[in-house]
Structure formats: structure tokens, C-alpha cells
Amino acid sequence: MKTMQQRLAQATLPLVVLAALFTATHSAHAQTDRLIIENGDSALTKEQAREQKEQWDATHRLRGKVNNRVEKEFDKADRAYDNQDNCEQSLNVNAYWEPNTLRCLDRRTGRPVTP
């Protein structure tokens, strides 16, 4: 009779161990519908910060380019205005201001004149 109980115990032991493992793994599953961030520092926030920095840098470079272009166009218009003023006040009677090319030209030759 003891041998029968021993055989039964030996046969059920692996089943009990498997059941215990299944129960342990089943209860070990974590609830994944919540995100916990410790100290506000995660890969997602670092990535967002990097993307925002790249966007700010690109915007800053673009603004710099636009400002340089506006300044260049202003300087060009300012020089043209000064050149027109100098050409019209020139003592050279053959000098005239060409508004299309923004240059002071000689009436006889059509070449640029330095007023």
C-alpha cells in the first residue's frame, strides 16, 4: 500500500510543481495600462526635448537668414537712394539716373558714371 501512495505522490509532484509555476507566472504579470515616470526623466521626454531643440535651432537659423536677407535688401535700396541723390546733384551735365538699373549713366555713351 505504501508503494502505491509513493507512486501516486511521485506522479502528482510534477503536476503540483507545474500548477505552482503557472500560478506564479500568472500573478507575476504586471498591469501595463499605466505609465509611471520617475523624476520626470524618461526616454520619451528626452526625445521630445531633443526634437524641440532641433526645431528651435532650425527656426533660429531660418530667422537669421531672413534677417540677413532683409538687411541686405535694405542696404541695397539705401545705397541706390544715395547714388541717385549723388547722380542728380552731380556737376556732370551728361549724367542721368536710370531707375530700372539703379545706376548713374552717361547720356552720350550709356556707360556708368561715377558722380
From Swiss-Prot:
Record's signal peptide: 1-30
Q: Is Signal one of the keywords? A: yes
Q: Which domain of life is it from?
A: Bacteria
* Stored InterPro entries: DUF1283
* TM helices/strands, residue ranges: none
Concerning HAMAP family, the annotation shows:
UPF0482
Instruction: Tell me its family.
Output: Belongs to the UPF0482 family.
Q: What is this protein called?
A: UPF0482 protein ETA_17520
